């Protein structure tokens, strides 16, 4: 029997603005049944602060999956920001630094960090606009720096993008930075694995990558987005979940959240996923990990 009663998947967005159509929350119950979307308080979409309040107020043991990076690369250079004396020593220090430098940004946005005279040097901002520290000296690829977990993600058949990359439809840098602001403000109200040890009871927040869930749900090919109810229900069936109601098209934010909530329910008892070989104490403390990467 699961120690979690609920499985909550959050498809996140780092876009500007008070409310985001790109944020979707879905809940699967340990007792069974199809995953369900949680309606935002406003038809215009979720505010990031509302998601923060929901997480801080969880009343039943919930395994939360956030589709964002909870850390930045550290192991490859022994620092998040090599050459910058303000570079923090661990993930919680990173979250605090980002939140402090973005204090003037509304809606948990992160413009203040990526435009900071030092911080901006580590990011790719646009075509032909790349910070002088985006790449490490002697880098073998132009893709940017990656965390240890992202190397593990590739073994699942997906292609992660560097969290230092702010360009393109697949970039996750902005969403990760806004998510780190939220995690800082969560302030330990809910443990964040593996930055914090996995608690024996209560709720816990993890990082997820919805493409990994899609792969394990049987979605194949170069694209891992599910855009029809029929395809979503096929994937849910593979994960042992009852289907959701609906026909025709579904937006990929909603399908990502629904599929991943069911996936969390299906795989959370697999001990190996909580103990991947490359997850050392240093990696846990600094970069964090993607639940499901092995």
Regions found by a protein language model. Give the residues of each.
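RNase H-like (RuvC/DEDD) metal-dependent nuclease/polynucleotide-processing core
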Residues: 2-8, 12-294
């Amino acid at each position: 029997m699961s120690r979690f009663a609920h499985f909550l998947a959050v498809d996140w967005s780092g876009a500007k603005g008070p409310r985001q159509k790109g944020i979707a929350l879905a809940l699967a119950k340990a007792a069974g049944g199809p995953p369900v979307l949680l309606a935002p308080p406003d038809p215009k979409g979720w505010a990031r602060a509302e998601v923060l309040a929901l997480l801080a107020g969880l009343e039943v043991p919930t395994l939360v999956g956030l589709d964002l990076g909870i850390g930045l690369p550290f192991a490859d250079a022994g620092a998040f920001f090599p050459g910058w004396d303000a570079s923090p020593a661990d993930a919680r220090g990173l979250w605090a630094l980002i939140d402090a430098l973005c204090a003037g940004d509304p809606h948990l946005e992160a413009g203040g960090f990526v435009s900071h005279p030092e911080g901006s040097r580590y990011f790719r901002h646009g075509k032909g606009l790349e910070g002088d520290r985006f790449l490490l000296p002697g880098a073998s690829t132009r893709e940017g720096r990656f965390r240890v977990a992202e190397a593990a993600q590739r073994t699942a058949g997906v292609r992660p993008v560097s969290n230092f990359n702010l360009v393109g439809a697949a970039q996750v840098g902005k969403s990760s930075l806004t998510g780190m602001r939220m995690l800082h403000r969560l302030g330990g109200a809910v443990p964040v694995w593996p930055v914090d040890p996995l608690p024996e009871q209560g709720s816990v927040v993890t990082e997820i990558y919805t493409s990994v869930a899609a792969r394990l749900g049987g979605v194949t090919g170069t694209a891992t987005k599910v855009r029809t109810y029929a395809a979503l229900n096929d994937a849910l069936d593979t994960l042992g979940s009852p289907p959701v109601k609906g026909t025709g098209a579904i937006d990929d934010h909603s399908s990502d959240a629904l599929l991943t909530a069911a996936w969390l329910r299906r795989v959370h008892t697999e001990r190996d996923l909580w103990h991947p070989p490359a997850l050392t104490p240093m990696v846990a403390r600094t970069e964090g990990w993607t639940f499901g990467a092995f």
